[in-house]
Structure formats: structure tokens, C-alpha cells
A protein has these predicted regions:
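Active-site helix-to-loop segments that bind/position phosphate- or nucleotide-bearing substrates
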Residues: 79
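An extended, acidic, His-containing surface patch that forms the Zn2+-binding/catalytic region
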Residues: 1-66, 70-74, 82-95, 103, ...
Length: 213
């Protein structure tokens, strides 16, 4: 990403530390992960969960239904920025405008889409509630859970953290091959049973008392 306003200034050390234990792999039977994808110099986990990514959702040039052997007069693209905490969303379009103008593309028009935007949120992995949840799940499951400071997708978590001022910890119950948002989306019964045990243990420990913050 060439526009500085499109990325955070850095990845916090606490985030880097927990992401060092995360291994991002492709699903069985799925496409291989492109080794050159994402920001150079970052690990694959840091690229997904600690940095921003600019995607081309759709692109059209000329008339696809009636292509001709000529340079088309116009092109159109729908872009999407997957961003993390530390990016000022109000500064995105002005920064892109300056970037295009500086490189001789003042004639290119830009504008926001009509889609809603989720504000990025992140729980500090060093927060006492995070360690409380990790300890509880470890006791119940018998192994330490993976810790993600935030997800790589879109969630309306800002409603809880920014509007209501709450501390949030998500405990998902799924697995990589669940085909989420795709045909045959599913979850094995064993994972549901495991999730019930984990949450029962977590709520039991919460009832025993939370750490003071």
C-alpha cells in the first residue's frame, strides 16, 4: 500500500507477540496462499490480523459484452480497504485524492460507496480480562487457546466498545473448513459440544469473580 494514511504507524508489541504464535494455513483442498501477498516484511499472521489490505472488489474497462480493438475511454473499479486500529477513516479519501493528483491522475474521480463502514476495534492482549479468559479456557480445555487481537473480517464490535464503552472478548466456535458465507456452511457437532464445555467453564469462572481493572 503506497498511501501512508491507509496503514497504521506500527503494530503494537503486544499484538506482535500474540501473533507470533499464530500459523495461517490454507484449507484442505483450497487454493494455496500466495507467498508474495500482503505487506512486505510482515509475517502472514501480521498481514492478516495486524495490517491493512486494499482489495479490488470489481473492475470494468470498456464494454465486456461487446469488446472492440480500441483503447476504452473510461474504466471503473470498486475498491475496499480492510483496515485495523490506527487508521483515520475520515482521512482516507483526502489522502487518496492527494496521492492521485501527485502522480498525475487529477482526472480520476473518487468517492465513497453507499455501503456501511465498520469501525476497527482491538482488545489489548495484555488486558487483565484477556489473561483471565485465557486461563479459564486453558483449565477447561487442557491447552492454551489461540489469541487474536482482532479478526481479519468485518464485525460491528465498535457498537460495544465505542458506543457502550464495554470490554469485549470474542470466543468463536468453528474451524477453518466451515465454508463460512459459502455453499455447505456447517459446523461439526463435536465443535458445538466443545464450545458448550468451554463457555460453561468460562461463565463459571466469571461467577467466581473477575480481576479488578
Amino acid at each position: 500500500i503506497r498511501v501512508p494514511d491507509f496503514v497504521p504507524k506500527e503494530i503494537p508489541s503486544s499484538v506482535r507477540r500474540v501473533l507470533a504464535d499464530i500459523e495461517v494455513t490454507s484449507n484442505e483442498g483450497g487454493p494455496a496462499i500466495e507467498p508474495h501477498w500482503g505487506e512486505p516484511g510482515l509475517t502472514l499472521a501480521e498481514k492478516v490480523f495486524g495490517w491493512c489490505n486494499l482489495e479490488v472488489l470489481a473492475f470494468e474497462c470498456g464494454n465486456p459484452k461487446a469488446p472492440v480493438n480500441a483503447i476504452p475511454p473510461r474504466a471503473w473499479a470498486r475498491m475496499q480497504l480492510r483496515f485495523v486500529v490506527g487508521v483515520d477513516t475520515d482521512a482516507l479519501l483526502p489522502a487518496l485524492r492527494r496521492h492521485l493528483d501527485r502522480h498525475g491522475f487529477a482526472h480520476v474521480r473518487i468517492g465513497p460507496s453507499r455501503d456501511d463502514m465498520f469501525i476497527a476495534t482491538r482488545m489489548d492482549p495484555d488486558h487483565p480480562y484477556v489473561q483471565f479468559a485465557v486461563d479459564s479456557l486453558t483449565r477447561t480445555y487442557g491447552a492454551k487457546p489461540a489469541i487474536l487481537p482482532n479478526l481479519g473480517g468485518s464485525l460491528p464490535n465498535d457498537i460495544f466498545t465505542e458506543v457502550l464503552g464495554l470490554t469485549t472478548i470474542w470466543v468463536p466456535h468453528s474451524y477453518p473448513a466451515c465454508s463460512q458465507h459459502a455453499p455447505n456452511e456447517h459446523v461439526p457437532v463435536t465443535i458445538v459440544e466443545e464450545g458448550i464445555r468451554l463457555m460453561a467453564g468460562l461463565y463459571w469462572d466469571i461467577g467466581e469473580g473477575l480481576p479488578k481493572v
